[in-house]
């Protein structure tokens, strides 16, 4: 179930303050955040936000297509190590 339209999008208060300050000054610098649940709003377009994935901050450049999505969608938290090698499995079965 999605968030009520009456409430509006959730954006971390401190993140929003930093974005607005950068928009006023016209600066373009990377903003670090741990708020993966924050929704991307039009004010963020053109900025680079470093989203924490549990191990490190992943830089995400915000474009117009991303509006309405969450920041966490663009910073994957899991690494795929690959499937087991078939040759290694056959060797184990013979023993």
From Swiss-Prot:
Classification via Pfam families: Ribosomal_S19
Residues of the signal peptide: none
Region (Disordered): 76-95
Highest taxon, organism lineage: Bacteria
InterPro entries linked: Ribosomal_uS19 (IPR002222), Ribosomal_uS19_bac-type (IPR005732), Ribosomal_uS19_CS (IPR020934), Ribosomal_uS19_SF (IPR023575)
GO cellular component: cytoplasm; small ribosomal subunit
Ranges of Basic and acidic residues composition bias in the record: 82-95
Keywords tagged on the record: Ribonucleoprotein, Ribosomal protein, RNA-binding, rRNA-binding
GO molecular function: rRNA binding; structural constituent of ribosome
Function according to Swiss-Prot or TrEMBL: Protein S19 forms a complex with S13 that binds strongly to the 16S ribosomal RNA.
Name under which the protein is recorded: Small ribosomal subunit protein uS19
């Amino acid at each position: 179930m999605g968030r009520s339209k009456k409430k509006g999008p959730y954006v971390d208060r401190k993140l929003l303050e930093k974005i607005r300050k950068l928009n006023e000054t016209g600066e373009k610098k990377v903003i670090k955040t741990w708020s993966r649940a924050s929704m991307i709003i039009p004010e963020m377009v053109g900025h680079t936000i470093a989203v924490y994935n549990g191990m490190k901050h992943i830089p995400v450049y915000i474009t117009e297509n991303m509006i309405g999505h969450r920041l966490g969608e663009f910073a994957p938290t899991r690494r795929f190590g690959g499937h087991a090698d078939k040759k290694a499995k056959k060797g184990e079965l013979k023993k």
